[in-house]
Amino acid sequence: WSLNDYLGLANHPEVRKADTEAAAQYGAAYPMGARMMSGHTKYHEQLENELAAFVMKESAYLLNFGYQGMVSIIDALVTRNDVIVYDVDGHACIIDGVRLHSGKRFTYKHNDIESMEKNLQRATKIATETGGGILFITEGVFGMRGQQGKLKEIVEMKKKYNFRLLVDDAHGFGTLGKTGAGAGEEQDCQDGIDVYFSTFAKSMANIGAFVAADKDIIDYLKYNLRSQMFAKALPMIQTVGSLKRLQLLRDNPGLKDKLWENVNALQNGLRSKGFNIGDTNTCVTPVYLEGSVPEAMVMVNDLRENYGIFLSIVIY
């Protein structure tokens, strides 16, 4: 009940076989170098090309970690003259990436269109004065609440305000959209996302991440992402293993169908029993409880010890 393994790929026999064979052939260390030096292989390039095609972008670039990658992407995309506008409920990697920004930044109320517009107006005024641009950041799926980001409405606002849209779709990739390409595909606005980011830690049941965008943006990021320039390339076990995972995700829509069968059964069952799961419209299923932390811990322990159900609590 607390796992990231949305599609069940972690224990899929073909995945385990691919991981085992990659480990036997390459070990844990290879390649011994950064991508810009000696760490580039045909498998890294193949995975990037397949990921870009899957999420309908021109180019993609592999990242060693999701959290670290997003922090570095934000740092690379803006200068002190630029303005960042982002959702107040953004993931920690977004918040920490924004903290590195030496220019102005504004938060808007969670998924609130009116608040978005108000802050875009403020950002536009400042960017006009500084000669900079605006980076707008949101999530495809908010991992605590389970709501989709209002991507379609945000993309529509690009007609009125001049900004670049960065979307963290960690929970949408593989779970939403006709082909599993994420929240942008689900909302029919994938083309309007300028910079698309996702991790391998959810649907792909692996370690690593990627960013996808137009080729000129990716070429720029390759030489400006400090988290990648000064780190080894993604190991071969993760790279080759991710190729197999992506193949299974792409070629087996039944994986996503089964996920949603389970999600609907769970969410409908919880609602029918009177549990408050908010207004989630994704696989993320929060159960909001009133009471104290000690009471919540008693419930968690009871479910684990007496019912064989393991879950976690999140405290605000």
Where are these regions (language model features)?
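Conserved PLP cofactor-binding pocket of PLP-dependent enzymes
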Residues: 29-31, 36-37, 280, 284, ...
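Active-site phosphate-binding strand-loop segment of PLP-dependent enzymes
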Residues: 5, 106, 110-166
